[in-house]
């Protein structure tokens, strides 16, 4: 995406696939542009327009006009809703917090249909982005929501920001502070926003058992990740086999794994259901 400032206007262009959003806000005196729609709401602007893929618009105090029309193909980043989008923001007309709650509701319905994880003491989210998914799960299942560990954030960045995996793992681990009364002897179900390599997930489970948890169940709000993304540093990898879902497929299929990746990526196929189990 691109934003150009001139003496009399702004020119904004969204990337050709619409991977990331560009919003135009408007009030009685003019317009503004932002990546996150919540960025201008506290200043009195309201959502006025969202650019489509490859669309370019000219913005003045009187409004905006399209210089290049939007393309039809949209490939917006799903991780905006699942992980790194701000809860107050809307993308393509869908609020981030609402979408995360819906994901949790869907996970709870699936567990109910399968008859699994029905005697859990608490539903929890891997903070922060896992929390709204977990709240949706708790509301749908009727199981109480609790926070068995709290994330200490003042001295630590978001764990996906460091450029190497070792540092990402260290940040994630150091931020976790347990609430022992909510862990010891309890059956816990945690909802995480996604599972990429599985290293942080493993450390979270080990952390909970080390603090006395009786059972730990994990649910992922994001479908299995089979391919890395060149745009996101937390999903890039030296080898596709670093991705947990990809490794699991090879464990199930051996050297024939590559031939069935599409089937495992589709939740409606037998292989897709097998992977999730």
List each language-model region with its residue ranges.
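PRPP-dependent phosphoribosyltransferase catalytic core
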Residues: 8-10, 14, 21, 26, ...
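Feature representing long, continuous alpha-helical segments
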Residues: 101, 105, 109, 131, ...
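Generic enzyme active-site microenvironment
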Residues: 13, 190-191
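N-terminal segments that mediate ammonia production and transfer
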Residues: 1-130, 138-180
């Amino acid at each position: 995406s691109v934003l150009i400032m001139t003496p009399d206007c702004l020119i904004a262009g969204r990337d050709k696939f619409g991977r990331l959003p560009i919003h135009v806000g408007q009030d009685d005196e003019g317009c503004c542009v932002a990546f996150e729609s919540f960025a201008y709401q506290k200043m009195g602007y309201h959502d006025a327009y969202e650019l489509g893929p490859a669309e370019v618009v000219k913005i003045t105090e009187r409004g905006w006009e399209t210089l290049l029309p939007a393309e039809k193909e949209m490939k917006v980043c799903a991780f905006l809703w699942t992980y790194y989008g701000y809860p107050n923001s809307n993308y393509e007309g869908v609020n981030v917090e609402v979408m995360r709650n819906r994901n949790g509701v869907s996970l709870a319905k699936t567990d109910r249909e399968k008859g699994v994880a029905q005697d859990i003491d608490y539903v929890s989210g891997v903070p922060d982005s896992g929390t709204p998914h977990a709240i949706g799960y708790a509301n749908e299942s009727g199981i109480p929501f609790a926070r068995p560990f709290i994330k200490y954030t003042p001295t630590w960045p978001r764990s996906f920001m460091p450029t190497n995996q070792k540092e990402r793992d260290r940040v994630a681990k150091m931020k976790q502070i347990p609430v022992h009364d909510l862990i010891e002897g309890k059956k816990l179900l945690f909802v995480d926003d996604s599972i990429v390599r599985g290293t942080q997930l493993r450390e979270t489970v080990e952390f909970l058992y080390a603090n006395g948890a009786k059972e730990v169940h994990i649910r992922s709000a994001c479908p299995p990740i089979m391919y890395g993304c060149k745009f996101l540093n937390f999903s890039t990898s030296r080898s596709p086999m670093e991705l947990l879902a990809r490794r699991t497929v090879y464990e199930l299929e051996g050297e024939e794994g590559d031939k069935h990746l599409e089937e495992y990526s589709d939740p409606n196929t037998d292989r897709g259901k097998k992977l999730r189990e």
